[in-house]
């Protein structure tokens, strides 16, 4: 009787579940993800790589199909892959259920040997942390299953895991060594961690420049762009050793030059907190009023001179196969190479990841006329925008060099959510063949991928002697999406950016214009120039232009977003 009752209850349960499904409950289609943001895997020739995707909403009836081209290479959830030939291989996984299907693509790089590669952003001089606070280390390591890890503090092993959380209750300096080992070799990264009381934490502030040139009557905005360990500091500002003219918690000071004489003025900012006092002197050269150094109009439409080119690390930095490529050893050599070739750089105008920039100028002052005044070529098309912010400058001191005040040309995203002023990223020199690690002034870290299919042995600018460098500007939010397996799109913004597919400022009426990614111009109005506080700059003309990659993002194995520019033109002469 109990057995009959038990069977009856089971049948009732099945019936109820069936009724629920019939009443409209639907299992969603499957989803696929992998154990890394960019699904690129590496394996040694002749070795087996097991790829275990994370698949949801599959039930018990999922069908798995792994394909290399048109050939099926697997029908299980996990893929065991090996190859006797080196190279990059693209594999597609399809998961199908009664509710639908999902598909993702990944890349497998087959290498003849592989020593573990470590990428980790380590500040110059190591880390500093408050006593009793945790410091988490999560290095990016490319490795195989037989790779082992060790963390040592002062030569004593403390962990055998890839990630490690440092925590010390005693002050002092600790030597940290992280090592990854496999049969092909080992790689290590070594640095120090200084554990301090609050009063001993080193205060740091970084200024983009300590010398400013500005036309008489204008307001110049002085501030550090990166502050560390301020601990509720106050900032006091003096002009020419006079009385304090501003004091409080803000590190931004707007100096109105209307009451100052033409010439050099010293501005002193003093930081005070409960532990230390620190001062910095900033030189402000008040120049003659706007228009004094205005240059006469010529018939030259295009920019005639390049002044400065400094890309961020990227897949196209140091490319040996670029037309006219030259191996530079100093920044001065790079600048000289573009001096008479402002069309772009020797790479065709690729500015690299966030912050990379180029500065060009004209043989005349470009007027702020009616409508658009400037045209800057980029190679954007629908679904492929890599926006750069445009800055403009007058030759305020009349020396013919772009060493005056930059004004941002306000675009459609200015001041909106995700837009950040004074956004700074520090890039760190890697070992050859490895990713470039970065650290930003918002507390984030990441890497610029080393793509075997695009780059030589390093993506860090070869000509820089320093082991790190910092780029600062304004940042736009990323609009990068994977719309289908292996197919990434970089969506455009409405208007106001270089290398951005905007029908409005490209003067187009076709959504599918420029499908081949040829160079085509975005157009800009000098009237959109704004001061640091967002107020109109009211420039009558400009002499110099800077374009800077404005997004910090990656599009899968296509790599980093990198603004690309071509010719710069005075559009007033084209109307």
Predicted features and spans:
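Bacterial Sec-dependent N-terminal signal peptides
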Residues: 1-45, 98-119, 184-192, 196
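Extracellular interdomain linker/stem segments of modular secreted and single-pass surface proteins
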Residues: 109-117, 195-202, 285-297
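Acidic, glycine-anchored loop motifs typical of Ca2+
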Residues: 396-405, 423
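Conserved structural position at the C-terminal beta-strand
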Residues: 95, 180, 269-271
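A short beta-strand segment in extracellular, disulfide-stabilized domains
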Residues: 46-57, 131-141, 217-227
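A domain-level signal for the mature, folded cores of soluble proteins
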Residues: 136, 204-206, 281-386, 410-575
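Solvent-exposed loop segments of extracellular immunoglobulin-like
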Residues: 57-65, 143-150, 230-236
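Surface-exposed, flexible coil segments in extracellular/virion-facing regions
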Residues: 65-82, 150-167, 238-255
């Amino acid at each position: 009787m109990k057995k009959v009752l038990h069977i009856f209850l089971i049948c009732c349960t099945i019936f109820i579940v069936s009724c629920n499904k019939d009443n409209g409950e639907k299992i969603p289609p499957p989803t696929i993800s992998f154990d890394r943001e960019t699904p690129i895997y590496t394996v040694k020739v002749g070795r087996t790589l097991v790829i275990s995707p994370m698949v949801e909403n599959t039930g018990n009836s999922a069908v798995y199909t792994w394909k290399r081209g048109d050939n099926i290479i697997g029908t299980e959830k996990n893929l065991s892959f090996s190859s006797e030939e080196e190279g990059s291989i693209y594999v597609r996984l399809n998961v199908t259920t009664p509710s639908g299907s999902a598909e993702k693509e990944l890349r497998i790089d087959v290498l003849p040997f592989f020593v573990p590669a470590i990428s980790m952003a380590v500040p110059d001089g190591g880390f500093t942390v408050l006593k009793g606070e945790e410091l988490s280390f999560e290095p990016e390591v490319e490795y195989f299953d037989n790779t082992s890890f060790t963390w040592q503090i002062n030569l004593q092993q403390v962990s055998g895991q890839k990630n490690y959380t440092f925590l010390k209750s005693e002050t002092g300096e600790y030597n940290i060594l992280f090592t990854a080992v496999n049969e092909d070799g080992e790689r290590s990264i070594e640095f120090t961690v200084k554990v301090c009381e609050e009063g001993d934490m080193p205060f740091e502030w970084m200024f983009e420049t300590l010398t400013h040139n500005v036309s008489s009557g204008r307001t110049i905005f002085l501030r550090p762009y990166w502050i560390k360990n301020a601990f509720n500091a106050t900032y006091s500002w003096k002009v020419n050793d006079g009385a304090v003219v501003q004091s409080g918690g803000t590190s931004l000071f707007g100096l109105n030059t209307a009451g100052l004489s033409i010439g050099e003025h010293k501005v002193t900012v003093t930081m005070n907190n409960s532990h230390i006092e620190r001062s910095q002197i900033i030189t402000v050269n008040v120049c003659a009023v706007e228009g004094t150094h205005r240059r006469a109009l010529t018939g030259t439409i295009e920019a005639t001179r390049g002044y400065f080119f400094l890309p961020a690390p990227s897949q196209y930095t140091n490319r040996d196969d670029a037309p006219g490529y030259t191996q530079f050893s100093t920044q001065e050599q790079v600048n000289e190479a573009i001096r008479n070739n402002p069309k772009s750089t020797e790479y065709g105008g690729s500015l690299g990841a966030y912050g990379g920039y180029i500065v060009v100028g004209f043989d005349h002052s470009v007027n702020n006329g009616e409508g658009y005044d400037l045209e800057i070529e980029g190679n954007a098309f629908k679904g492929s925008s890599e926006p750069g912010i445009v800055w403009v400058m007058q030759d305020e001191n009349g020396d013919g060099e772009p060493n005056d005040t930059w004004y941002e040309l306000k675009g459609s995203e200015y001041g909106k959510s995700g837009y950040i002023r004074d956004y700074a990223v520090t890039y760190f020199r890697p070992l050859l063949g490895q990713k470039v690690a970065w650290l930003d002034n918002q507390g984030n870290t990441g890497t610029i991928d080393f793509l075997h299919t695009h780059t030589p042995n390093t993506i860090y600018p070869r000509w820089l002697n320093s082991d790190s460098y910092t780029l600062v500007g304004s940042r736009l939010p990323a609009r990068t999406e994977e719309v289908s397996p292996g197919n990434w799109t970089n969506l455009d913004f409405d208007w106001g950016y270089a290398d951005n597919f905007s029908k409005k400022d490209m003067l187009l009426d076709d959504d599918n214009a420029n499908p081949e990614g040829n160079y085509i111009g975005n157009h800009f109005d000098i009237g959109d120039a704004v001061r640091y506080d967002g107020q109109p700059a009211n420039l009558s003309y400009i002499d110099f232009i800077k374009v800077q990659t404005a997004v910090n993002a990656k599009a899968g194995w296509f790599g980093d977003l990198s603004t690309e520019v071509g010719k710069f033109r005075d559009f007033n002469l084209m109307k």
